[in-house]
Amino acid sequence: MIGGGVVGAAITRALALRGVAVTLLEAESELARGASGANSGILHVGFDSGPAELETELILRSARLRDPVLDRLGVPVLRCGAVIRPRDREEADTVAALKANADRNGVEVALGDDGALEVPGEAVTDPVAYTQGLAALAAAAGAEVRRDARLEAIEPAGDRLILQTGDGDRLDCSLAVNSAGLRGDEVARFVGDDSFSIYPRKGEFFVFEPPDGESLERILLPVPTKRTKGVLVFPTVDGKWVAGPTAHDQEDKDDWSVRDGAFDEVMSKARAMLPALEGAEPIASYAGLRPAGRGCNYVIGPSSPCPRLINVAAIRSTGVTASLGIADYVLGLLADAGVEPRAEREPPAGAPVPEPADPWWLRAGRREARA
């Protein structure tokens, strides 16, 4: 398993619980140091996902699998629901279309007399704790989790693959899964696969202490556009408020900085949804880099030049949301490739799930400082 983000951790857990020998390679010193650790932490239910798309199928599948896993992990979850409030006739028409879309997807929503769309299933978690918890359960079930293990090369060798890491280790495996996020296209090129390209779409967020006497009971979603879901305002599991993200395309995969002007860009939209933010100053900020595909989305399947490498790439902005569904889908691909997973077993009793010392938004801000 190449990449220790939330998708890689979810696939590793799914394999380990089915008795498959699996090693997770993470280039960084800790898991979820990329896109998986710098996002909203919102667990979407797929009410707005388009029909007949793989992304939609896997979001819906993940939503069905999610609650027992969250309960087992014991990570913090705020099951607060979400609301979208249209501001004009055009937005009201869009919200009505979202309601019809949710009905087609089988997602529970309600359209109020005021035209607002209520989505009770939306929730917020700590995405870093979630990722690390999935990996901890995988390790307890027999998986090996290697940190500081940056992949340098993949060598096809008959019916095997040899993976070489930066510290000189060579790992012999029958199959490899490329879940390297922003570096997914670079990993694919190790086997001559240039069928997709990944670029970073930066999303900047700002964290606030709630003003005295104010409360935020639900996730506030804007009416989406064709390009982005827009700026949200949401409560965190530790009682803060967050506004964001932006959607800024760039080429640098290592630039995690918050741009000058991003605060004004976010707050002009956030204050319209939540006037209590007027005059509020952030206590922290952070930027995440979504692994966006150039003209593609949810590239999941065997690599054409090297079918023993399974690509799981261009999971732009729904990795936390869809991770369990993606893992379930990849299990099917691996079975087709000759892996024979057994029936899922319960993780060992008392399997340790780490409790991060700091909230995820603070750790995400440190990534910006390091960059």
Give residue spans per PLM region.
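Dinucleotide-binding Rossmann-like beta1-alpha1 core, especially the glycine-rich loop
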Residues: 41-118, 230-231
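Glycine-rich FAD pyrophosphate-binding loop
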Residues: 17-38
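Helical element adjacent to the flavin cofactor pocket in flavoenzyme catalytic cores
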Residues: 121-175, 183
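Helix-loop-beta segment of a Rossmann-like dinucleotide-binding subdomain
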Residues: 74-84, 108-141, 162-163, 246-254, ...
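C-terminal catalytic lobe of FAD-dependent flavoproteins
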Residues: 127, 133, 228, 237-238, ...
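Flavin-dependent oxidoreductases
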Residues: 10, 154-159, 163-244, 248-261, ...
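N-terminal Rossmann-like FAD-binding beta1-loop-alpha1 element of flavoenzymes
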Residues: 1-24
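Short beta-strand to alpha-helix junction loop
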Residues: 50, 57-60, 85-94, 117-137, ...
